Design a protein with these regions (language model features):
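C-terminal/domain-terminus segments
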Residues: 25, 105, 109-138, 142, ...
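Acidic/histidine-enriched, glycine/proline-rich intrinsically disordered or flexible terminal extensions
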Residues: 155-169
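Acidic, carboxylate-rich catalytic segments that either coordinate divalent cations
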Residues: 145
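Flexible, glycine/small-residue-enriched loop-and-beta-strand segment within the central core
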Residues: 2-13, 18-111, 140, 148-149
């Protein structure tokens, strides 16, 4: 049982965050995990371009979050053992996961993507573009399927009142 943290000095973790076994977080330029987050087993986060995960996020098993990606056109060298000066087309762009996002199992998120608040991403989807807030996405590539109810916002407020009350007691 283990979770690996590479460049841990580049990783910040908030309150009430759980990282399950067999996860790998590679700090890169920075990974910031806010509060009330669950990262299920087998999640890989590559922080070469930066990753921000806001409050109340659920990341299901075997999700890959890439904020850096090699070039697949043949115009650059690849592999981590090769210095970046030989990778002129390396893509680095921050991934931002908004509040109250749920990411289904087996999802891959590519560099530069922002998941809007309340987004839900269906299992085994490939997210290549930003998502709208309070929307359900699925597929390869992920496309909007439906809207998501915002009813949970009231529950979130109730939870925070109770949680903060317990913390200050």
């Amino acid at each position: 049982d283990w979770a690996r943290f590479y460049s841990p000095e580049k990783i910040t973790i908030g309150n009430n965050v759980r990282v399950d076994d067999f996860c790998m977080l590679s700090g890169g330029v920075g990974i910031e995990l806010k509060d009330h987050i669950h990262i299920a087993c087998g999640v890989y986060m590559y922080g070469g371009g930066g990753i921000l995960v806001e409050d109340f996020v659920g990341i299901s098993t075997h999700v890959n979050i890439w904020s850096q990606s090699d070039d697949f056109s043949g115009r650059s060298m690849f592999c981590p053992q090769i210095p970046e000066k030989y990778k002129p087309h390396l893509k680095k762009a921050k991934v931002h996961i908004g509040k109250q996002v749920l990411i289904g199992c087996g999802v891959s998120i590519l560099p530069g993507v922002t998941l809007g608040e309340g987004s839900i991403i269906g299992a085994h989807s490939l997210v290549t573009k930003d998502t709208l807030p309070w929307s359900l996405y699925a597929g390869v590539p992920a496309k909007k399927i439906d809207n998501v109810s915002q009813d949970m916002l009231k529950l979130r407020e109730q939870f925070l009142e109770e949680y903060d009350g317990k913390r200050s007691a």
